[in-house]
Amino acid sequence: GYHIWHCGGHDGAVRADGALGQYVISILDKDMVVVMTEATLGNGRDQRRLIWDVLLPTIKDEPLPVNKKDYQLLQKKQAVYKLPEVKGKASSAFASNWENKTIELGKNPFGWKSLRMNFGKKEVMLTVTETTGKTYELPFGYKEWKTTSMDAYPPYSITPVDRFKGLEGPYWVAGSYAWTSKEEVQLKAHYVNWVSALEM
């Protein structure tokens, strides 16, 4: 669901706030609606500032002239836009220190009990065991997003009562990884039909 607020930055603007950076901003005097969806733990101030400082000053009351060249350029850019993968190397000799070893976790908001990693040529398979005993695997690709579906609930930064009530899976996850140093591997998971992302 969304909360509805008066939106600072422009008189008469109204915004609907969803969790983790879901915004619907109505700028009534410009007959304009801006929709943003992202997975951020911030308050969205920087993103909204782009609307006020960059987008809004370019808005005019008269229709834009047809510009086929710019429209074709926009289409070309849209065709290649993608979520950037984690940057780094595909492998590290240090991986043998973690290969197939169980990492016990302390209490955490995700309900995860332990993690285990298996390293392939250009893939990391993360096995998650929840405190309930439920286990599932998340694949992470190198220079690509590996996707899978899962029946487990995705991580959520807030814990309202019954936050998943009435919601059914599967939830789709896209994972990317890279070794950012000899001893550090970074995993990034985006829950593509949910509102959260996770970096480890």
Regions flagged by a language model, labelled:
Residues T40-G42:
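A short acidic/small-residue loop/turn micro-motif
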Residues G1, L64-N67:
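Charged/polar, low-hydrophobicity segments characteristic of intrinsically disordered regions
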Residues G1-M36:
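Active-site Gly/Thr loop motif
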Residues K68-M200:
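Peripheral terminal and inter-domain segments
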Residues V34, P63-L64:
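N-terminal, helix-rich and Lys/Arg-enriched segments in bacterial and organellar proteins
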Residues R49-P63:
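Surface-exposed amphipathic alpha-helical segments
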